[in-house]
Structures are given as C-alpha cells and as structure tokens.
C-alpha cells in the first residue's frame, strides 16, 4: 500500500516522502521535499498527492537516478601540528521558501477546450489550430503575438514557424470543408437548419496597392482602402455554417448564390429557406434562387410600397392599424403589377397564376411609425433650413433645385409620410406553406447573422490586418470561422455575451509554486457567480 510519510529531519524540517509497505517493512519510493513552514508542508503534501494519483509521474520519479550529493573539496593538508585547528561543522543547507513562479488562466482555457471538443473540432487532430482558435476567442492578435496569449492561458505555445506551417495546412486539402461539416453536424443535431440566414460585410486593408483579391469597392464605412467582401451563412440562432471571401469590388448581390451552392453541395441539402436583407434584393438574384429550387425571404425596399399596396391605398387610404399585415403581390421586374387595384381583396400569390410576380408581405407597426416620423421631421427641418438659406449643406432629402433655387419637395414628403410604419418582405413561399406572421418572424431572425458579423469584426477582429496573401487571408478566415462557432456555443450555453464570459473567467488565475525543487499548480478559488458560468459551459468536465 502506497502512502504519504512525514518525517522530522535533523535540521528541524519535515520531510515529505512517498512510501509503501513491502514484506512488512516500509520502503521509500520517492522523496518529495522538506518543508520548514506549514505553508511549505501543504504544498509538498499536495505535490505528493498528485504524484500518487499519476502513476506515470511516480514511475519516472522512482526510476530516475538520484543526483549524487555535492561534497565540498577539502583544503590541501597543511603542516602537521600537535593540536589540529578547530574545524567548523559543515553548514546545513536549507532550501529557500516557496515561490510563485507563474500564474495563468488555465480554467478558462479548459472550459473553451471542452466546448471546442463538444463541437467535434478535436477530430481535426491539430492541436496548434485548436490553440490558435481559442487564442483568437480570448484575445485577437497577430500570429506572432498568439504565443503570449497562449502562455497566459497556461499553454506552452508552438513556435512561430510551426504556427505558420499550420496555416499552410489549413488552406490546403479540405480543412475548411471539414470545419464546415462539423459546424453543420452540430447545428443540425441541436437546432433547425431548414432556414438559414445570409449577409455580407467588407474587411479593409491599410495598403496602398490593390491585388487580385484586395480591391477598392463599395464600402458602407465610405473607405477608399482595398478590401475584401466576406459572406457568412448562419442558422436561425446565429451559429456559423459557411463562410467565403470575394474580391473587394464584387457586388454583394452576386455573392449569395456561390455561398448557398457550396453549402448545398457539401451537405446534400435541397429543401431550405434562405433569408437575406434588402441588399440582396435584385431581380437576377431572386430568379436564380428560385431556379435553384430554393425558397427565399428578403427585405423589400420602401420604393416598392406604392405599387404593392395600390389596392389598399385606393380602398383604405393611408390608414393602418397597429400590427396590420397585408399579403399581396410585387412585380418581379419593373413597375408593372399583376395586382388589379380596382379589386378590394388582395390577390393570393400563386406562381402559376402570377408568373411575373413574387409574394409580398407588408406589416405596419405603430412603434416603427413613431420612429419613422421622428426621422422624417428631422429631415424636413433640415430641408426647410436649407431652402430658407439658414443652413448651407449638400442637398438633403426633400430639397430640389429649380433654376439654381432650392425648393421644398412637398410631394416627396407626403409620399414618405404615407409609408411610415411599413416594412415589406418578398418571398417565393406560398401562403399555404408559410403564413405572413411566420414570414415576418423568419426575416427578423436576421439580427443573429448581423450579431455574428459584429462579433467577428469586434470581439474576434476578423480584419486580417497582418495577412497579405490570398492563402493567408483564407487561413485567417477559417480560424475566425471556428472561433465564431466556439463563441456562439459559449453564448448559447450561458446566455451571456462572449466578452462578458471572458471578463468573468479570465481573472480566475491558477498559481504555480516552486519549493524544494518541486513545482505544484494550485487552482483558484471560484466564486459562485463564475462557477455558475462554468457549470453552464461544461458542467463537470473541467477539473480545477
């Protein structure tokens, strides 16, 4: 039987040893160290317990050849005398007190590693990729600085050269395909992938010259730097399913079909609904999605409202009730409507009966109307100030110029006020399959993909400022894609923003103490609030 033995030493210390009973006698297996204080004794006892529970370490300690004792050289013999000079007794060496040699956030790392494994990413078999993904979740930084973040998480980081080799592996073969497949498997097992959400964003580079990928194009931030266009497909909860990048001058509307097609081919998915915002609304886009047997829900533009709602305006004027929904038609191209405004009843869209139209759903909200009116009032005030010469500015909305004189466009203001509170949606899903309320609810799930983009551009800093080549950018986006999946899963389990989770868990520091040549790491005391977060993330999978 193996046990821990405490023995007083001649120097007044307490030796901690691991021993066993063999043939009725005690046999020392390993000498752990000598303690001079209660604190040091506690450290050595904990170290001994760890050695006893880890046979591999104990075997190494037992089989290691003990270092020979260091003996000081004696002085050469001097002349003989009748009485030898007094010789000082050898000094008793005492090890110094215990010292803290490091502290880290390994509790946080263990929690994120558990989530990474639950998503199936551990089957990729690449520990360096895993560390780069988790480092980006915790603190986005350059590849060169990732080692510092990993060290702070209690990891021994790979060398910079190894990290670069990992990035090369990521862009070769089917690495991103494997990541996307694992994301799909997780999403399909834990949620609903019959409806997916798509959106695009731009990531700019502070460089002077364009190349084949980084080009100057349309930027919502009005930047003139070379950029790339990134498309992201997520499920209705915002969990990432597909990512792709395009040339910076590529129209956003021309990115949706390649991403959707790649997703379908990879996972053999045929029947699904694609939701996108009004920026994806182009006649060609919708036609191609329909020809690919895909169902879609996209936001409509306000300029379509007078045509789509012609019947309502004829029979009811501009009067709407809060929550009112109008299910009607919208022209596929142009302004010619198949809706007969002379009929009071709105037509029910049928693809065979209305080949030149899509189904349009318009909803009125009093809350939205109040917000729209507030915006219109400000715009009208600005326009009147410009017309009155009180304010010099670029021509604002509702101001027209006639013979060099600015005038207020009263007709445009009236048309705008007639449409306050309205929001439109275009779809090719018949009412028999999806009612108007579900169409509206599905579209409003788009905030999840918008939130994912905000996470990737802020919390994960997706902008690859240190990447220069196309392969490096693609590898960077693969890491961001996996990091977004981990972050989304953490948020889903805790109900907290990933930034909040990191702010609460990263300060939980484990301390490593060295004493008598031995090192032992002690976990932090975890307050109840942080323990609740850990339990939500991994249950009892993390041992402290």
Summary of predicted features, one role per range:
Residues 3, 13-15, 25-26, 112-544:
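Anion-binding and metal-coordination hotspots
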Residues 4-53:
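Short, surface-exposed polybasic/aromatic micro-patch for ligand or macromolecular engagement
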Residues 8-10, 31, 70, 76, ...:
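Intrinsically disordered, low-complexity segments enriched in small/polar residues
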Residues 49, 53-56, 168, 487:
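Generic short alpha-helical segment signal, independent of protein family or function
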Residues 44, 63, 85, 332, ...:
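Low-complexity, intrinsically disordered/propeptide-like segments
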Residues 55-154:
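Extended, charge-enriched "interface" segments that sit outside catalytic cores
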């Amino acid at each position: 039987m193996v046990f821990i033995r405490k023995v007083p030493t001649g120097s007044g210390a307490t030796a901690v040893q691991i021993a066993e009973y063999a043939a009725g006698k005690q046999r020392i297996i390993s000498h752990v160290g000598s303690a001079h204080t209660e604190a040091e004794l506690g450290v050595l006892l904990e170290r001994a317990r760890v050695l006893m529970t880890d046979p591999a370490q104990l075997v190494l300690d037992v089989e290691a050849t003990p270092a020979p004792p260091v003996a000081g050289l004696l002085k050469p013999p001097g002349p003989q005398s009748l009485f030898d000079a007094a010789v000082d007794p050898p000094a008793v060496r005492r090890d110094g007190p215990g010292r803290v040699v490091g502290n880290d956030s390994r509790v946080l790392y263990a929690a994120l590693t558990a989530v990474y494994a639950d998503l199936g990413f551990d089957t990729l078999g690449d520990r360096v990729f895993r560390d780069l993904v988790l480092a980006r979740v915790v603190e986005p930084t350059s590849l060169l600085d990732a080692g510092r973040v990993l060290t702070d998480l209690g990891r021994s980081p790979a060398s910079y050269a190894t990290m670069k080799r990992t990035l090369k592996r990521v862009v070769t073969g089917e690495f991103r395909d494997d990541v996307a497949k694992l994301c799909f498997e997780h999403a399909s097992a834990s949620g609903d992938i019959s409806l997916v959400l798509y959106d695009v964003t731009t990531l700019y580079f502070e460089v002077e010259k364009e190349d084949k990928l980084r080009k100057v194009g349309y930027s919502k931030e009005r930047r003139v730097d070379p950029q790339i266009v990134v498309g992201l497909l997520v499920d209705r909860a915002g969990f990432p399913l597909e990512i792709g990048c395009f040339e910076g001058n590529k129209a956003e509307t021309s990115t949706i079909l390649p991403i959707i097609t790649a997703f379908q081919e990879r996972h053999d998915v045929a029947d699904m609904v694609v939701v996108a915002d009004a920026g994806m609304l182009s006649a060609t886009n919708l036609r191609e999605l329909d020809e690919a047997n895909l169902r879609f829900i996209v936001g409509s533009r306000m300029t379509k409202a007078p045509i789509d709602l012609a019947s309502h305006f004829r029979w009811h004027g501009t009067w709407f009730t809060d929550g009112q929904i109008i299910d009607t038609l919208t022209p596929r191209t142009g302004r010619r409507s198949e809706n007969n405004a002379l009929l009071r009843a709105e037509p029910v869209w049928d693809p065979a009966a209305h080949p030149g139209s899509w189904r349009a759903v318009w909803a009125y909200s009093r809350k939205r109307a109040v917000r729209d009116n507030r915006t219109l009032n400000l715009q009208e005030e600005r326009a009147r100030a410009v017309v009155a010469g009180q304010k010099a500015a670029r021509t604002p909305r509702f101001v027209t110029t006639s013979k060099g004189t600015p005038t207020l466009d009263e007709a445009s203001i009236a048309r705008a006020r007639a449409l306050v509170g309205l929001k439109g949606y275009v779809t090719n899903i018949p009412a028999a399959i999806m009612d108007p309320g579900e169409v509206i609810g599905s579209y409003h799930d788009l905030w999840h993909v918008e939130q994912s983009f905000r996470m990737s551009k802020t919390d994960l800093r997706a902008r690859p400022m240190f990447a220069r080549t196309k392969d490096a950018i693609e590898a960077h986006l693969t890491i961001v894609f996996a990091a977004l999946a981990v972050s989304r899963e953490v948020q889903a389990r805790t109900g907290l923003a990933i930034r909040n989770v990191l702010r609460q868990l990263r300060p939980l520091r484990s301390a490593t103490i060295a004493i008598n040549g031995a090192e032992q790491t002690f976990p932090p005391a975890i307050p109840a609030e942080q323990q609740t977060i850990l339990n939500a993330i991994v249950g009892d999978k993390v041992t402290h």
